[in-house]
């Protein structure tokens, strides 16, 4: 279920809190979902008149592992809302690293999943629209340039123009 496009209607109906549903959700899932809904709520709060869900919010919610989204019974009786053909999860993105800090012009991070240098990564920073990070230059913790980050919990460095929180 995804009600983000209908936040304005939910607030008009008196909803005052939102809960992330599901069992065993990862820190990545919770971080993306919380950041996306925070962005949607802030956008709604700042809107003057007709509100439309920001495109980046929809894109982020489609990056996390999910089944086909629906609105359940919130907008009336659903027609053909139960999906049998595509009942599996959609998993097109993966968490590859968690940022630990920033030193000497580089993001320092702990690897979660492997990737090759040159792969553009999406960076999720609390309270911000996600942005791309170029990994053309990729270093191990000793500062040696590497072609791939491959070992779980490996410490890596990626040159970047600013600190990421």
Model feature map: region roles:
Residues 1-165:
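Surface-exposed amphipathic alpha-helical tracts and adjacent flexible/coil segments at the periphery
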């Amino acid at each position: 279920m995804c009600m983000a496009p209908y936040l304005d209607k939910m607030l008009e109906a008196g909803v005052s809190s939102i809960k992330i549903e599901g069992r065993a959700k990862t820190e990545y899932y919770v971080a993306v979902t919380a950041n996306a809904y925070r962005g949607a709520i802030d956008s709604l709060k700042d809107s003057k008149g007709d509100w439309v869900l920001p495109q980046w919010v929809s894109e982020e919610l489609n990056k996390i592992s999910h089944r086909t989204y629906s609105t359940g019974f919130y907008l009336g009786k659903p027609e053909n809302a139960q999906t049998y053909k595509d009942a599996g999860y959609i998993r097109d993105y993966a968490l590859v690293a968690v940022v630990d800090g920033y030193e000497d012009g580089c993001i320092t991070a702990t690897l979660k999943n492997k990737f090759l240098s040159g792969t553009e990564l999406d960076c999720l920073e609390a309270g911000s629209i996600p942005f791309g990070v170029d990994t053309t230059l990729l270093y191990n913790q000793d500062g040696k340039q590497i072609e791939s980050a491959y070992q779980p919990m490996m410490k890596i460095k990626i040159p970047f123009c600013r600190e990421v929180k």
